[in-house]
Amino acid sequence: MTDRYSKYTKFEFDRPADRVLRITLNNPKTYNSLDAVGHREFTYIWRDIDDDPDISAVILTGKGKAFSSGGDFGMIESNMNDETARIRAWKEARDLVYNIINCNKPIVSAINGVAVGAGLVAALLADISIAGKAAKIVDGHTRLGVAAGDCAVINWPLLCGMAKAKYLLMLCEPVDGETAEKYGLVSLCVPDAELQDKALEVAKRLAAGAPSAIRWTKYALNNWYRMMGPAYDASTALEMLGFAGSEVREGLKSHLEKRKPVFDPNSPV
């Protein structure tokens, strides 16, 4: 792999076909969770991909049994206890979404197993999202005790409708690959054994297509997301505001203790 990607330490890279780059989240022992370094790399790698003249399509997947379990507990605790870390997380969360939206290369996600948090952001913002039947897609923000930020407010209602988006986001309801396809959250669902081959097939077709036409189509369609920028910015700010509150402390504690959270029913909101 070229020096362009040698600075990224949390991912594996390979080129399974001509002009196709595959990025594999590589921390299988923790279901490909992202620490502070991984989160930052995941945010800014899309700028290098955008500038890479040697690739025409990208595959994103996870190593082992999961796509990604999102930010690790260390990141959550830092966001709770350190204002500087919280502001940095807000900035990276913002940049991650816009960097994916603005990346000129078409992105194919191959969603294997659990997809949560920042990993789920990329999985569902991908231009073509392909889930294995055993995929488990869940936005766990409200279960943790913070508002659903990331990009859910701008893409879930577009993908599956406002009514279903509210149901899934407010209740942190998990969906498998087949259900995600039924709801419109993903482009396709395939048997798990066929997932990587299908993602590669799609990426090769994209790489062989008319590059300007495909990139302009992506750019135009993603204006739906750009128009929702103010809503996205508000949701992410509210998420970060929650990290300074009490609900997230109970959410994290209950998760570590493997029990249901018991939140104070009173709220000034």
Model-derived regions, located:
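Conserved CoA-thioester-binding segment of acyl-CoA-metabolizing enzymes
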Residues: 1-63, 98
